[in-house]
Amino acid sequence: MLHIINRSPQSNNALENCLNTAAGGDILLIEDAVYAATAGNAIEGTLRAAMGRFKISVLRPDLEARGLADRLIEGVSPVDYGGFVDLTANNKTCQSWL
């Protein structure tokens, strides 16, 4: 399953809810959720711990638009829009967390 999250972990608990509820799969962080994939943020440890159960990707254009490309956590895969399409096509179901 592909889990899509678009809210910053500082303003919304969608990512934490996903990590606490879902059994595994792919996570794609888009829009303001890309802040969760940066070194030094409050949820960095939680995200790193989840890497055993989830493959975590971040939408590179959103990361770059926020000037955060150089702060990406090791183990998180940046993807372009084509990669977003591939993740969607490779998963039978997609869940957007609000």
PLM features: what roles do these ranges have?
Residues 19-23, 46-53:
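Short, conserved loop/helix-junction motifs that constitute active-site signature segments
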Residues 12, 40-44, 78-81:
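Structural motif corresponding to alpha-helix initiation and N-cap regions
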Residues 66-98:
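C-terminal structural segments of small proteins and small subunits
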Residues 33-49, 68:
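N-terminal beta-loop-helix "entrance" segment that forms/cooperates
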Residues 1-14, 31-39:
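Short, glycine-rich nucleotide/cofactor-binding loops
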Residues 25-31, 54-62:
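Short internal beta-strands
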Residues 10-24:
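Histidine-anchored nucleotide/phosphate-binding helix
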Residues 2, 26, 93-94:
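Structural motif
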